[in-house]
């Protein structure tokens, strides 16, 4: 609507110190509230309160409003939501009255029938500016200190009916960070905030001091916080719903329905400016949990790698013994099991030296894995090896003998060359080299399908170096 009407007031009010308490409570209520309040704020602003809110008299109850005005002011004053309205009432300073929000259905006709009065609006703008200066810097304006005593009892009302305890600390942070434009968009009545608290008695600190919270303030009245949270758990969207009449509440509901289609943008602003207190409170622990999980994952990964290395050493030790016992199995068992394992373990082993920055070890491991994967660990369990061999295409009794070709001398020579290379690199501690050359072809009951021609072999095997492996056997 006519948001530009607010320009002088916003410009004159650079920091909203007061938007802390009143907007805390304000936000507790439904998000439609923000939009409707903005709208009525504009409406009443336009019509300059000529509909019965007497801005020149220091009374919050305007003449024509009668009982409705009382209702609106008394009940919402407790919550600190509607008190935002009565700037004009307190100082004769402004038309910024939102008194009729809950019964806006009834008073809407009044708004529409009124005609804006520009001159009074300008005068009230000037008054507002003076008032802001006085409220922001009470020590500079002694007259102001003396004059609006009734406005200084802010703390009493808020602490008697404290805001939602969850929302208190994080909300204040958000409001301090946001600039006035954001506050205006999200439906915060920044201009009307300062005198927004209810008048309980004429005593109390200055407005400015009352609005700036002390760091340790929230837990001052723990019992009341508890009662407040209980009320909220019951599910009333307005904690002190009992204080205002059902009729007013229903009227607000009806107007909220009318405006609901267009509330989305304001809701978005509300969420961005001040996410719900639960989010704010849970954000920190959630972050720490995530970081902890990350570090745990890394440490677990490193532990697992260490464990793998230890297991490798144990298996290396057991390899020598198992090879003496299982000479007949040695070559063809190691073929399949190591092809499968080496594909997986090659990655692990290459990762560790990269972390340590040891380039020579990396190159050695790459040589080992790409040229001769069979040099790795033998499994201690024969049954597991049998199972693996069957899965990879080994057969117990050769039904297809015609496909098995004898190993040629060229293949044996190639095998010896590769094994010598690896021995130079120091990667072969024991066993397979001498056994591979000694146990000439005691195949036993198992036949290896890798003896097929290399063209078929490419289809059946998985390792990238399979062809050279076949030659090696």
UniProtKB/Swiss-Prot annotation:
Which InterPro entries does this UniProt record tie to the protein?
Vasculin_fam (IPR028128)
What are the Basic and acidic residues biased-composition ranges? 119-133, 293-329
From start to end residue, where is composition biased (Acidic residues)?
456-473
- Mark the residues carrying the PTM Omega-N-methylarginine: 87
What positions belong to coiled-coil segments? none
Q: Which gene encodes it?
A: GPBP1
In the UniProt record, which is one GO cellular component term?
nucleus
Q: Where is the composition biased (Polar residues)?
A: 194-204, 251-286
Which keywords belong to this entry? Activator, DNA-binding, Methylation, Nucleus, Phosphoprotein, Transcription, Transcription regulation
Q: List the protein's name.
A: Vasculin
Subcellular location field:
Nucleus
Biological role: Functions as a GC-rich promoter-specific transactivating transcription factor.
Q: Where is the composition biased (Low complexity)?
A: 93-107
Residues bearing PTM Phosphoserine: 49, 274, 276, 322, 381
């Amino acid at each position: 609507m006519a948001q530009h009407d607010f320009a002088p007031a916003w410009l004159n009010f650079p920091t909203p110190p007061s938007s802390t308490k009143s907007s805390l409570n304000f936000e507790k209520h439904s998000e439609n509230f923000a939009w409707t309040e903005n709208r009525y704020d504009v409406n009443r602003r336009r019509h300059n309160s000529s509909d019965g809110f007497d801005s020149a008299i220091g009374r919050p109850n305007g003449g024509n409003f009668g009982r409705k005005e009382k209702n609106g002011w008394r009940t919402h004053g407790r919550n600190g939501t509607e008190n935002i309205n009565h700037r004009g009432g307190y100082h004769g300073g402004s038309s910024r009255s939102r008194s009729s929000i809950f019964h806006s259905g009834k008073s809407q006709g009044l708004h529409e029938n009124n005609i804006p009065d520009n001159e009074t609006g300008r005068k009230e703008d000037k008054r507002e500016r003076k008032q802001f200066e006085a409220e922001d810097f009470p020590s500079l304006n002694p007259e102001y200190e003396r004059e609006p005593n009734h406005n200084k009892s802010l703390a009493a009302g808020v602490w008697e009916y404290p805001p939602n305890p969850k929302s208190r600390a994080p909300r204040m942070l958000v409001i301090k960070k946001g600039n006035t434009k954001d506050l205006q968009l999200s439906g915060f009545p920044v201009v009307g905030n300062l005198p927004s608290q209810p008048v309980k008695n004429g005593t109390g600190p200055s407005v400015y001091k009352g609005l700036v919270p002390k760091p340790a303030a929230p837990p001052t009245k723990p019992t009341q916080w508890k009662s407040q949270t209980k009320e909220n758990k019951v599910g009333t969207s307005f904690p002190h719903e009992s204080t205002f009449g059902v009729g007013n509440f229903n009227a607000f509901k009806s107007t909220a329905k009318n405006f609901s289609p267009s509330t989305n943008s304001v809701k978005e602003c509300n969420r961005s400016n001040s996410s719900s207190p639960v989010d704010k409170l849970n954000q920190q622990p959630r972050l720490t949990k995530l970081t902890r999980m990350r570090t745990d994952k890394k440490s677990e990964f490193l532990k697992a790698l260490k464990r793998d290395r230890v297991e490798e050493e144990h298996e290396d030790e057991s390899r020598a013994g198992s090879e003496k016992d299982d000479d007949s199995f040695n070559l063809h068992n190691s073929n399949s099991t190591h092809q499968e394992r080496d594909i997986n373990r090659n990655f692990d082993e290459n990762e560790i030296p990269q972390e340590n920055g040891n380039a020579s070890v990396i190159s050695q491991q790459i040589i080992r894995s790409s040229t001769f994967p069979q040099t790795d660990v033998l499994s201690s369990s024969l049954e597991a090896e049998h199972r693996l061999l069957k899965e990879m295409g080994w057969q117990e009794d050769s039904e297809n003998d015609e496909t098995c070709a004898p190993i040629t001398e060229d293949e044996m020579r190639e095998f010896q060359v590769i094994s010598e290379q690896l021995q130079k690199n120091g990667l072969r501690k024991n066993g397979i080299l001498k056994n591979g050359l000694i146990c000439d072809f005691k195949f036993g009951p198992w036949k290896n399908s890798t003896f097929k021609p290399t063209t078929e072999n490419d289809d059946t095997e998985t390792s990238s170096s399979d062809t050279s492996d076949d030659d090696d056997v």
